[in-house]
């Protein structure tokens, strides 16, 4: 027996670097295409415990297994994990027939995605004495729940902001270098070609990068990975868009080595049937990909994708406004013009991405190197109303609300009669409830003006705009490069490493969008004109081009470029031992940022034009972790990491629209994270329980607002912010019977500020620091996510390829985003203590239903239907977010000074009531 085990160990070692075929038939194939699945990992537990990387067949290895009962787990990137039980008798073949792996379903919940069917699942394990069926998905049950079920409440995994998660496309980082936020919308609608994904949580090793404290997700769009197919899709919904049409074609890898793939999608909705009025949607999406297999070791691919989109935006408002209109889904951005609804806030973007990739894999499959060059370009604009020397056009402006005359007014001047009049107007007059577009046009057309410069020279005569629509642009140009290598020098050792570089230039400027019946805009700094009326130079937006008269399509107001670059080198080593997988990793990242001004401002002639100083950061990351296999079904896992992370451009520079000043002594964030997990992988039960702790220090935050007490637009820079993220999460799938599966997920967190950070306040029209102190946040809760979330669901899988499911969900302990102004010494001294306490949003409960059906018309031709109904109980009173306004109402004290009186009301948004999504797909 010892001799046999020795022979087996040697054979497994050989197999781990690519075992030759003995039968000519691959052991593991794709369930749809029938092609061999590359890089399949198998974990063997029984009398012999071993992990190995299969070649295309390993029957000769499995035939050498000693007598006994074994658990075999097969996994491959982009596929569901398959776990089987094998009873091996002495001196007999394994009896293991060809296995089919099923590609991951998009989303992982069977709701918005297509049901994938394997026709012969029931026959895969013929010849085995103890057959166990396929586990439903290799995706983590908790991540599946948090990615879809919890998203209705804007759940953020472990309380992390988007900047602590990393989104990649073919190995290229796609998080915005200016803000840190992810960029899913760049390929919105391209569901069919973005399904292949590699996901890692909490620094777990992946081939494409070092990892981050949150979730790393790499989307792969390699054309040769798509099975040969045509795919037609139609979707209908009452969410943001009403209809979606899509067509996808993939050739598969042809005999001549070429692979082609293409996809086009159309998403449309006029806002009439969307859940919130004014949320119209008009979007195209496209993808083109070609790949050539140069030889057995090298392939080259070129892809291009984009998603030109135009959509109406809804904004949060106060509960007073919702109550006045009788709906928690009121949109303050809209009003009627010519009998049609018009939205003042519109997002328009089209940022195509072109990528050239080279793939190398040696004949032994022990070395893989992927290299990608990427270029991103295009336009991204966000429209907004602008006005000067005219009444505020926003319907929910605080002076137009009944509360302005009562609780928001000086106690000595409250007017209940005026409040009653405004309440009645809100309920009866649509021109009060919504933006009065006709009135804006009327005002502009009546404003015949002659504009003169300081010397009396006439600049323009005509209808000067008092109201207008401006488009705020953030147009990015980014070149990026990344390479990663995966090397298997030994059967027990796997080394991954790589390098990447990104250089981003983002043009930030305002553009005249719609003059609303006027002829021109006089481009001056309106706040400077108010504050320095006697000095015309101060109000100049650009001293190099003074007294500009601008019209539709012209740049005005501000114009600068944010320049950022980052390069990183990283390496991981993973050790595959008999019952232990362990890894260590290290990374070094260098980041640089500077501002390039294209205007010489009258207020800041010396530090607004040209290049600023370059601010640089050098950051280190280290990580380690281990997974211990108790037996073939139960595992213990731990991960620990320390990471430094540079601040983003938007949090580094103070008022970059006007000058190149940045925060004093900027620091990188310091992130420490540790977690411990128990994982179970039984044929009938799959899941994990994790306890985690993360401490983030030296975070920086920048914000701007109108300070009523100083009657000026001001900037708040908060430095040294520390947060603590402590909690536990669990997710399980239980196969109750061959046709019934239960799933459950639970997140319990305590996400709090760990210190009282410092702040400085500056006035936008000067470099003067008007206030400097600390903010009392320690022990208060981090906002933006439910800190308690739970779901319990059942799914029935019928023998005729349909499934039906229900999920019951609970969300609690969600807090509004806190204003720092209230919690300073000044705020705590002047304001009532009740305003200092953080506001907790209402807890809530929702129920979701979903169903799917797949009909095989002929071999290789499928018609699939999906229907999802969310919040079937129509709970319309569950807030999913909110923020305290930064402005504070002031009153005049007896000594004539302005005294803080009470904060403006919190603005809230709500979970939609009952919504549906229907999807049908024809694949052939």
Question: Where are the regions that the model predicts?
Answer:
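Short acidic/polar hinge/loop motifs at secondary-structure boundaries
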Residues: 62, 134-135, 141-145, 172-203, ...
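Acidic/polar loop-and-plug regions of large Gram-negative outer-membrane beta-barrel proteins
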Residues: 299-355, 381-470, 534-552, 702-705
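Short strand-turn segments of transmembrane beta-barrel domains in outer membranes
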Residues: 203-206, 218-252, 264-266, 270-278, ...
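C-terminal beta-signal and adjacent terminal beta-strands/loops
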Residues: 696-697, 741-742, 810-827, 853-924
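Gram-negative outer-membrane beta-barrel transporters
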Residues: 693-695, 716-821, 919-923
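Signature of Gram-negative outer-membrane beta-barrel scaffolds
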Residues: 468, 472, 493-631, 656, ...
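Surface-exposed extracellular loop regions of Gram-negative outer-membrane beta-barrel proteins
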Residues: 312, 316-321, 539-549, 592-603, ...
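Outer-membrane beta-barrel signature, preferentially recognizing the C-terminal barrel domain
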Residues: 331-356, 612-621, 625, 633, ...
């Amino acid at each position: 027996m010892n001799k046999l085990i020795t022979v087996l160990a040697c054979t497994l070692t050989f197999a781990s670097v690519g075992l030759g075929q003995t039968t000519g038939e691959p052991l593991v194939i794709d369930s749809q295409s029938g092609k061999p699945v590359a890089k399949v990992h198998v974990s063997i537990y029984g009398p012999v415990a071993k992990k190995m990387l299969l070649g295309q067949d390993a029957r000769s290895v499995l035939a050498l297994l000693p007598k006994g009962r074994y658990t075999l787990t097969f996994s491959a990137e982009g596929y569901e994990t398959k776990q089987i039980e094998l009873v091996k008798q002495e001196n007999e073949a394994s009896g293991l027939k060809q296995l089919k792996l099923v590609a991951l379903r998009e989303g992982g919940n069977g709701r918005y995605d297509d049901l994938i069917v394997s026709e012969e699942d029931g026959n895969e394990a013929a010849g085995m004495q103890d057959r166990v069926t396929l586990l439903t998905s290799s995706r983590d049950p908790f991540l599946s729940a948090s990615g879809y079920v919890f998203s209705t409440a804007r759940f953020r995994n472990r309380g992390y902001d988007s900047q602590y998660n990393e989104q990649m496309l073919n190995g290229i980082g796609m998080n915005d270098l200016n803000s840190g936020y992810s960029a899913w919308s760049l390929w919105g609608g391209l569901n069919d070609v973005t399904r292949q994904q590699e996901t890692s949580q909490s620094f777990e090793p992946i081939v494409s990068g070092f990892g981050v404290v949150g979730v790393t997700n790499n989307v792969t769009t390699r054309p040769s990975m798509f099975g040969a197919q045509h795919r037609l899709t139609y979707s209908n919904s009452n969410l943001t868009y009403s209809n979606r049409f899509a067509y996808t074609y993939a050739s598969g890898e042809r005999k001549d080595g070429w692979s082609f793939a293409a996809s086009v999608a159309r998403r449309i909705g006029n806002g009439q049937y969307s859940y919130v009025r004014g949320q119209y949607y008009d979007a195209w999406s496209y993808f083109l990909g070609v790949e050539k297999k140069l030889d057995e070791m090298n392939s080259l691919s070129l892809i291009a994708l984009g998603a030109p989109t135009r959509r109406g935006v809804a904004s949060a408002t106060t509960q007073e406004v919702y109550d006045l209109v009788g709906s928690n889904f009121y949109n303050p951005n809209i009003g009627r013009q010519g009998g049609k609804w018009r939205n003042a806030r519109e997002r328009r973007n089209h940022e195509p991405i072109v990528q050239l990739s080279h793939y190398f894999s040696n004949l032994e499959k022990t070395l893989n190197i992927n290299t990608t060059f990427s270029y991103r370009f295009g336009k991204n604009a966000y429209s907004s109303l602008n006005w000067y020397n005219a009444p505020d056009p926003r319907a929910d402006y605080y002076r137009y609300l009944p509360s302005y005359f009562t609780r928001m007014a000086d106690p000595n001047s409250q007017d209940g009669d005026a409040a009653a009049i405004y309440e009645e107007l809100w309920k009866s007059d649509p021109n009060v409830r919504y933006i009065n577009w006709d009135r804006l046009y009327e005002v502009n057309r009546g404003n015949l003006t002659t504009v003169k410069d300081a010397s009396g020279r006439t600049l323009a005569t005509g209808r000067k705009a008092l109201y207008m629509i401006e488009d705020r642009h953030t147009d990015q140009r980014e070149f990026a490069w990344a390479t990663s290598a995966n090397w298997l020098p030994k059967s027990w050792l796997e080394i991954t490493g790589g390098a990447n570089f990104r250089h981003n230039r983002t043009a930030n400027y305002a553009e005249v969008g719609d003059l609303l019946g006027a002829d021109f805009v006089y481009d001056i700094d309106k706040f400077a004109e108010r504050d320095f009326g006697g000095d015309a130079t101060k109000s100049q937006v650009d001293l190099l081009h003074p007294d500009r008269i601008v019209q539709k399509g012209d740049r005005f107001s501000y114009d600068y470029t944010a320049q950022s670059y980052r390069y990183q080198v990283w390496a991981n080593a993973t050790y595959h031992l008999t019952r232990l997988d362990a890894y260590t990793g290290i990374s070094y990242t260098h980041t640089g940022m500077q501002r390039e001004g294209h205007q010489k401002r009258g207020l800041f002639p010396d530090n607004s034009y040209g290049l600023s100083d370059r601010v640089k950061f050098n950051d280190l990351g280290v990580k380690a972790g281990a997974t211990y296999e108790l037996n073939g079904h139960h595992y213990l896992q731990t991960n620990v990491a320390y990471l430094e992370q540079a601040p983003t451009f938007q949090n580094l520079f103070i008022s970059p629209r006007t000058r190149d000043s940045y925060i004093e002594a900027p620091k990188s964030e310091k992130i420490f994270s540790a977690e411990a997990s128990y994982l179970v992988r039984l044929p009938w039960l799959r899941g994990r329980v994790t306890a985690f702790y993360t401490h983030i220090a030296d975070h920086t935050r920048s914000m701007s607002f109108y300070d009523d007490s100083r009657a000026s637009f001001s900037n708040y820079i908060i430095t040294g912010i520390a947060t603590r993220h402590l909690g536990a999460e669990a997710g399980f799938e239980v196969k109750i019977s061959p046709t019934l599966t239960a799933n459950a997920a639970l997140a319990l967190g305590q996400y709090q500020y760990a210190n009282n950070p410092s702040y400085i306040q500056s006035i936008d029209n000067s470099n003067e620091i008007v206030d400097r102190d600390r903010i009392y946040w320690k022990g208060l809760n981090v906002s933006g996510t439910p800190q308690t979330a739970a779901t319990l669901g059942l799914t029935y899988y019928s023998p005729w390829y349909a499934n039906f499911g229900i999920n019951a969900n609970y969300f609690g302990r969600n807090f509004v985003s806190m204003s720092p102004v209230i919690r300073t010494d000044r705020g705590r001294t002047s304001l009532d203590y009740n305003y200092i306490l953080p506001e907790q949003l209402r807890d809530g409960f929702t129920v979701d239903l979903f169903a799917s059906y797949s009909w095989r018309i002929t071999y290789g031709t499928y018609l699939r239907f999906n229907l999802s109904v969310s919040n079937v109980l129509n709970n319309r009173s569950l807030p999913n977010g909110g923020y305290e306004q930064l402005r504070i109402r002031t009153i005049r004290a007896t000594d004539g000074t302005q005294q803080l009186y009470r904060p403006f009301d919190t603005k809230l948004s709500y979970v939609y009531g009952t919504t549906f999504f229907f999807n049908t797909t024809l694949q052939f």
